[in-house]
From Swiss-Prot:
Keywords: Acyltransferase, Developmental protein, Endoplasmic reticulum, Flavonoid biosynthesis, Transferase. Disulfide bonds: none annotated. CoA binds at K63, L64, E65, H66, L67, C68, K69, T70, L274, G314, G315, P316, A317. Substrate binds at G224, D225. One of its GO terms (cellular component) is endoplasmic reticulum. This is Type III polyketide synthase A. Plant type III polyketide synthases (PKSs) that catalyzes the condensation of malonyl-CoA units with various CoA ester starter molecules to generate a diverse array of natural products including long-chain alkyl alpha-pyrones. Accepts up to C(20) chain-length fatty acyl CoAs as starter substrates, and carries out sequential condensations with malonyl-CoA to produce triketide and tetraketide alpha-pyrones, potential sporopollenin precursors. Favorite substrates for are midchain- and v-hydroxylated fatty acyl-CoAs (e.g. 12-hydroxyoctadecanoyl-CoA and 16-hydroxyhexadecanoyl-CoA). InterPro entries: Chalcone/stilbene_synt_C, Chalcone/stilbene_synt_N, Polyketide_synthase_type-III, Thiolase-like. GO terms for molecular function: tetraketide alpha-pyrone synthase activity. Disruption phenotype: Pollen exine layer defects. Reduced accumulation of flavonoid precursors and flavonoids in developing anthers. Plants lacking both PKS-A and PKS-B are completely male sterile, with no apparent exine, thus leading to pollen grain collapse under vacuum. Altered pollen-stigma adhesion. The active site is at C172 (nucleophile). It holds the Pfam family Chal_sti_synt_C.
Amino acid sequence: MSNSRMNGVEKLSSKSTRRVANAGKATLLALGKAFPSQVVPQENLVEGFLRDTKCDDAFIKEKLEHLCKTTTVKTRYTVLTREILAKYPELTTEGSPTIKQRLEIANEAVVEMALEASLGCIKEWGRPVEDITHIVYVSSSEIRLPGGDLYLSAKLGLRNDVNRVMLYFLGCYGGVTGLRVAKDIAENNPGSRVLLTTSETTILGFRPPNKARPYDLVGAALFGDGAAAVIIGADPRECEAPFMELHYAVQQFLPGTQNVIEGRLTEEGINFKLGRDLPQKIEENIEEFCKKLMGKAGDESMEFNDMFWAVHPGGPAILNRLETKLKLEKEKLESSRRALVDYGNVSSNTILYVMEYMRDELKKKGDAAQEWGLGLAFGPGITFEGLLIRSLTSS
């Protein structure tokens, strides 16, 4: 198979069925995902949430109904079941010190979901589990020593000299941080294969609604539980099927915005605060951030609509503002909107669900698909995480 090289990037030959990855660049080799068994259709959310929390406040019901419609979410999954509420009724008692109970549930649940997602990913990858040299584990939903990275490694049967990295409490941008860290590991350790796993549950923040905590209702209407996994490595072998190349990664925070998104762990669980100006702050800074990433593609004529977009769907308002600010064509954020509809905002996991949809979309387009794209996520800080991605998929 012949190929030419322009701007440091390998190009397809006319007979190729996949773009060739650049030597030494990290590539995505397989994906997996997992969810708890409890499915929550959005149309049933209000009735179930108010019943479980023993709330009969008409104002709260009306507010939650409105939020459920505006989120665009249709389906979510949750660890929380009636059996759990029967065992721990104090979870629905205002002011009850329940952090111990919440962690008993969460610590086990996130590892089990991570295990299922990882097994699916490894199966798609097709190589022995012993070939995994590094594991990066991302979660904002568990607290213990040792962490979920060790428990997951043991359950998967990874070698006891596997190199482990645990990323705690990053929030919604954690999945892209994990990709950035895994990219650095893969590119600086020749022959390495990195398993990145993210796993999240909302059990730490579940509580009865209170008018003094309006964000709790946003969380009830928007967030879900689940896990995701991806194998990352440079210089793929013939037995591997790379579909995206992580060409460049960057993180930055917006000075003076650390109070816009806050989470504080208390005896009652984790209390969140979300500023109403979050979408505006993202809108005001997104264009410069994206141009910084695009500049690394080596094509100064490239415009926003010349690329594919994998954006963490923090909520419809963020997607709408980004779309308007960058003058994106409607279909550019379709994978992000689809992930939001199907799973809700699942914190760090969600970007990997978006990338799975994007992989399918690029494959369907074949030679007509864009070669370059951006992966973006936003979270506490306000922190921006970004990836310049190169699609390796063609017809």
